Amino acid sequence: FNWSRTAGANIDLSPGFEHKVLETLPDGSQRVQTWTGTIERVTPGVVSIPSEDDYLLKDRAAFEELYLPKMQYFEDRVNVGYFKSLNDKRDWDLPLGIFLGSVMGKIRDMCTVTGMSYLIYDEDEELFADIVNAYADMQYKCIKQILETGAKFDFGHFWEDICYKNGPLISPELFDELTAEHYKRRTDLCKEYGIDIVSLDCDGVVEKLLPTWVNNGVNTMFPIEIGVWGDQFYPARQKFGNKVLGVGGMDKTAFRRDKAAVDAELERMKRLASEGGFIPCPDHRLMPGSKFELVQYYAEEVKKCL
């Protein structure tokens, strides 16, 4: 699978906020407003994740005046002509997915992890629910419009980075309360149009959110980061059985060690792949210190696992 080969609508804030430099600080760093309305600290020439300085989505007034108008559905969010032409261009042998959007991860992008926490606990859950519902309703309408064009897809794919190395960035109970209906609504729509593989991209330790996803139609985990916390796919298989599929789950730190470490990882991948419904691969980028000859060796040997 090439999981980047998905097609979708414009389901972001539209129009986005103006991307502009608000202030240049004495150390040369800049406070920059992004298209999501967050204020980031950026150092020119430094390629890294910028720190979050501030955000606009702080209360109901900001939501209703600044954000809600940008979350509205309109037909031009979908390039209908492009999707109608997709079936005529299906001369490739790779699967094509429909992008199913994000229920909460993109909202976390809009208000930062800190801001999301304050919105829930210092403002009120009703406001946060209104934000989730407004954004989700627009996305659903776009996805439905795409499928109604007759374009054929092999899988659906969510993006939902809402976990980190210690688990979810939000209470699993509240996450389920706010998001379950929106996952089910979209996965039911996928089933209606013959799409039975629905994957979800979430980094970090996802175990506590799996019940929400699996019980509402998501059946494929990605990228199954190993990180510092270890394997997550085998426990998921033990709990949910073969209805949970996986893409990822390879411990890429083996590339920094030796051939024996890669062989051990290949053996672990082979056991998982032998059950079916699992495609091994490393997550994201390879780490500094990785040995290219070990990557080459893995790339050849992993084919034997599939």
Regions found by a protein language model. Name each.
Residues 1-5, 24-26, 91-92:
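Short, solvent-exposed loop/edge-beta patches enriched in aromatic
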Residues 1-20:
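Segments that shape or occlude catalytic/ligand-binding pockets
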Residues 52-56, 111:
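Short, helix-capping/interhelical loops that line the mouth of catalytic, cofactor-
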Residues 39-53:
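Short amphipathic beta-strand/extended segments with alternating polar/hydrophobic composition
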Residues 19-43:
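Serine/threonine-rich low-complexity intrinsically disordered regions
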Residues 31-33, 39, 60-306:
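Active-site loop segments of alpha/beta catalytic cores
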